[in-house]
Amino acid sequence: TNIPPHNLREVIGAVVKIIDNRINEDRDTTLEEILEIVKGPDFPTGGTIIGKTAIEEAYRTGRAKIRVRAVTNIEPMANGKNRIVVTELPYMVNKARLIEKIAELVRDKRIDGITDLRDESDREGMRIAIELRRDVNPNIILNQLYKHTQLQDTFGVIMLALVDNQPKVLNLYEMLKYYLMHQEDVVTRRTKYDLNKAEERAHILEGLIIALDNIDRVISIIRGSENVQTARESLMKEFNLTEAQSQAIVDMRLRALTGLERSKIEAELAELQKKIDEYKAILADKNKLLTVIKT
């Protein structure tokens, strides 16, 4: 797979569009709607994409060859000469190798008219200066550089992904759709995990409340038991507790057990119950699940 980098805001905007259409209109999103949001690749090194046809082809079919040119300017010099200044390179083009290639073309006389070649890059940005003879047309030299060097390069787009463990070339909408399906799976698993943990904790708190309501008897049972197992079994039998609840009680030191504040436990339990209700609502309603992903 070879997918060019994109502007994150545009990609997120497209995913949000898919979610909104499902929630508000109960329909799929068209590729045309996606193309209104995602304008094209966003190469971090800059460069200029030549033509829009290849971009649309990539988004519609999952395959295309996108031509990218360096950003250049022709600057007149004080001595009457011109120079070509390169300030942005096509994606993945190595600056040092590019300069070597230009020098090689000049040395082999495949390009005639370049008198000096300098890397003037600094912390302000990338800059390559190509000085020319007075008698040459800078546009002709520039076109020769596009032809023979990576000042013009091709990015081959292949939007390949595993779908049901099978490689498949996807268009842009399909790629975003499967990404959203993955997010649905991730959020569902996470919510089930959070629900399970919240229910486990609530279950323990319910046992602690029972223990507090019968604190003297609980302490008597623990002190009168030969070992932890006997204490746990006695608590389970007398107060109809589960093994997890009774284990949580016997695991606490008596000082900690007697120091528990019922109001704090009840407050935590009430908060947990809200979360439990929220988790269950998310798992029961696809639109709520999509809203969680969106936010």
Regions found by a protein language model. Name each.
Residues N2-T295:
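C-terminal interaction appendages of subunits in large macromolecular complexes
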